């Protein structure tokens, strides 16, 4: 799959690939909304591999929606796009699943001078509370919110999910290297559910020799080829 990205903008990383595989294993069906789609790589991978899924890609940035359209056309994948701020989004439609790789860096971290990656990375642009609360509004009963987040903030994640009547039903930790602490938590939470939480085996990205066999296998499964693109000022 060919994915065009802004040369000087936010670029997807291994977190996206890990989340893609996590969602693929869950295999949600029906109407799926991706919040903060960026260049569209997560949603397009799922549209390619989940035959019973209808994907809608949402982003607050106009240039990202254009990238989603370019990438969906390039790969001949039929998805919908919505240019909107999820915090302000209003719709009567209810989704079977909402997926997101949300921003989780806090404001104390030194920011880039480039606005595009800042909006994608920092939680001030879409707080965890906003994501969870608004997902509850736009999900069907027992619909799934599937996302990744900073593993160090898992207690806050669990609190906000319970506060908004979600039940965490699946959890998987991603470790940057064997012997290191978990960096990312992959989470599925179901609205109005009382299910127990299944904790998956952890995933290790690298060892002393480089990427693990499991990571290389996953990268091959994703089969991504990234290309840089520069959008002109007029890209309606």
Language-model-detected regions and their locations in the chain:
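Short amphipathic alpha-helical segments
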Residues: 69-70, 110-112, 158-161
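S-adenosyl-L-methionine
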Residues: 1-26
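SAM/dcSAM-binding transferase cores
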Residues: 182-236
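Conserved SAM/SAH cofactor-binding pocket of Class I
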Residues: 21-91, 97-100, 106-108
């Amino acid at each position: 799959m060919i994915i065009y990205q802004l040369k000087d903008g936010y670029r997807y990383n291994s977190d996206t690939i890990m989340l893609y595989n996590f969602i693929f294993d869950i295999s949600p069906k029906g109407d799926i909304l991706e919040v903060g789609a960026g260049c569209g790589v997560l949603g397009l991978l799922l549209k390619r591999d989940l035959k019973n899924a209808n994907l809608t890609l949402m982003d607050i940035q106009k240039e990202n929606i254009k990238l989603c359209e370019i990438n969906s056309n390039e790969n001949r994948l039929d998805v919908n796009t919505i240019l909107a701020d999820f915090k302000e989004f209003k719709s009567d439609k209810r989704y079977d699943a909402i997926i997101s790789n949300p921003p989780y860096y806090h404001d104390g971290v030194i920011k880039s001078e480039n606005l595009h990656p800042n909006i994608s990375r920092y939680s001030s642009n879409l707080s965890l509370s906003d994501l969870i609360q608004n997902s509850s509004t736009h999900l069907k009963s027992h619909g799934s919110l599937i996302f990744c987040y900073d593993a160090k903030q898992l207690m806050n994640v669990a609190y906000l999910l319970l506060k908004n009547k979600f039940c965490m039903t699946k959890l998987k930790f991603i470790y940057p290297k064997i012997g290191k602490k978990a960096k990312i938590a992959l989470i599925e939470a179901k609205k109005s559910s009382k299910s127990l939480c299944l904790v998956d085996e952890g995933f290790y990205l690298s060892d002393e020799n480089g990427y693990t066999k499991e990571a290389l296998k996953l990268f091959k499964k994703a089969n991504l080829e990234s290309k840089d693109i520069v959008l002109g000022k007029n890209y309606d």
